[in-house]
Amino acid sequence: MHLHRHLPVVKPLIAALALTLLPLSARAEISFSVSPIRIELSGEQGGTHTDAMEVRNEGNEKVRIKVSMQDWYLSEEGTPIFQKGGTQAHSCTGWMKINPVDFLLQAGEKKVVRYSVAIPAGIKDGGYWGAFVFETVPQVVPGQKTKAVAIKGNIGSIVYIVVGKPVPAGDILDMTYDARKGRKILTKVKNTGTVHFRIKGNIKITDTAGKTVQTTDLPDVPVLADSSRTIPVTLDDKLPAGGYTAVATVDIGGKAVLSGEFPFVVK
């Protein structure tokens, strides 16, 4: 039994570090890319998947790269936070393998690394996630003495796995108006199911006469199982003072579309 791969449209991610902390004699540009940066798989218990990734040295110096499998989660604002593999309840890092895990890349060189995923038998249906983290290892030149701080770059290639046929479920917990740093409508979405989903939909702003004065698409962002995410939408800066209603329509891929309304006043 095999896993099915869903290919998102994602550009390769490049980590470029300007080593401004180094003395002039030690400065060099470290830059590398990994593709793909998001892997989406689906399958049943006992399913397997094998594929490849490409790592390219975009800099002008050779780099040593180590690869590890790590857990991660998102803050309510969407910031990814990485942890040791096996920490999170929905971790799939124990199912993931990659080869090689330590290699050198000359300037301009690219390397194909192969990975595999094996879903354990008996695992519950639901969503699971992890990451292949590619990290540069500082090169130490024998006999060289420097007070420079070691600079490292890393790129996480995110892995999502859907086991079985779990149904996305969620709710809009809250909508607020925030005028502190630009006028924004903040919509808090809660994932109440066992599988991650991505946000689709929009925020529509109507005036007191019911006329639509602004419609803005929501960003295509993930909300992980057992978590909440606050989605900001910036209001038109030409919106005059007065009373308005924000109407949220959020498609999470389940059977129902989430909706919510929030009256607010622009001063």
Language-model segments: residues:
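Beta-sheet-dominated interaction scaffolds and their linkers
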Residues: 29-63, 100-103, 170-184
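Surface-exposed binding patches on compact interaction domains or structured appendages
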Residues: 30-36, 60-115, 200-203, 207-213
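Beta-strand-rich interaction surfaces with strong enrichment in secreted/lumenal proteins
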Residues: 39-41, 99-105, 174, 217-223, ...
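Ligand-binding face of N-terminal immunoglobulin V-set domains in extracellular IgSF glycoproteins
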Residues: 50-54, 64-67, 97-140
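Short edge beta-strand/loop segments characteristic of extracellular beta-sandwich folds
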Residues: 52-56, 186-192, 234
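Short, acidic/polar linear motifs in exposed loop/turn regions
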Residues: 59-61, 121, 138, 191-195, ...
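Short proline/glycine- and polar residue-rich coil/turn motifs
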Residues: 103-111, 220-228, 256, 266-267
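A short tyrosine-centered beta-strand micro-motif
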Residues: 128, 132, 242-248
